[in-house]
């Protein structure tokens, strides 16, 4: 390389770094795990002609840093990541774009145009359809927890209202965590009102499920992924974000309880009396799991063509969990781990059939296994302590069991995917080098 670079070469290099950072920003803000962000950025860098040995990428939750250096010249650029959400379609399309750009010799203008198209693409579902999906997802939870179909309907209505309230709060610029608390408050208040309708044989179940659309399943599983992949700093930030979301949800529920004097109807006692043993057939639980999985798929903006796939995944996860838990007697923790791991193992192969990232299929499929009854037992027990012997033990037991189930769900999703990535990484790298060599032969590859 010459010792000096012309202004035109510097401008071209900075444009490449800008495109690289904008790609990474879209991935981070769409809730991609850090390993996927780095892999995609390295692939895009290869397309841009930025050698991996000269490229340095640092990913954090709120900032991306890219540096390219050859010993004589060094250029760095920063990109803030602020508008975090969940957009599985964007994650999938960026992965495809990174390969397509190499195979089809995209110009920088073509790549930028495609990137902008992905960024500005309308979501697959309009807001009210997403809210309906969120409502039915929580209704599915209610049915999985043992509620009847009337309780399913009440839960769906309450969750729909809470979801729309949260969306409106976000539109008005209200703090993210405060929006969650307000949504949980509204959902719980409406569920409380449904107690007095007298139309359901399981009137307390809507209180268990009406706010579960807030469950931070994607941040939780990304946290486990990042920690296992040794992205400790990002993983810790995701964990803190997850805890804050759960605390905000709990805060809203607690306020609702105090405002409506829920303790006067002894709801905490009712929750402790709810059975953890399924009373319905596997068919009913399969239907409820499919509804819940598809509802969360809409929240995560998964392509319509994959809804049935995720529904099947939810059925497999829940039925496997119930079989291992109740038929084999291994308990809910091992049952949840096996349910999520079976889905993740199937997804390792299914990603090649449907051409989407692993998490697009696995995360919505395992969400229906969230232990809502145990979570609410722990929450209600904690805030209604009166110094009676055994209260602390019950709260800690329920809390630890719920936490272990959630952790095992996340591990069951993450571990098979991580091991599979390591096995196929060499094949992907070899394929990438073959495609780059073809570009060189076509005279389209220009290295910095």
Residue ranges and their predicted role:
Residues 1-113, 117:
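Soluble N-terminal domains of membrane-associated systems
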Residues 109-122, 135-147, 163-174, 263-277, ...:
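Short juxtamembrane and helix-loop transition motifs at transmembrane-helix boundaries
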Residues 123-222, 299-300, 304-309:
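Core alpha-helical transmembrane segments of integral membrane proteins
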Residues 128-132, 152-157, 178-182, 239, ...:
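Hydrophobic alpha-helical transmembrane segments
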Residues 134-143, 159-164, 185-193, 249-257, ...:
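Hydrophobic core segments of alpha-helical transmembrane domains in multi-pass membrane transport
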Residues 142-158, 203-216, 270-289, 329-341, ...:
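Structural signature of hydrophobic alpha-helical transmembrane segments
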Residues 190-200, 250-264, 321-333, 374-390:
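Hydrophobic alpha-helical transmembrane segments in multi-pass integral membrane proteins
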Residues 206-210, 222-226, 230-247, 282, ...:
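C-terminal transmembrane helix-loop-helix hairpin of multi-pass membrane proteins
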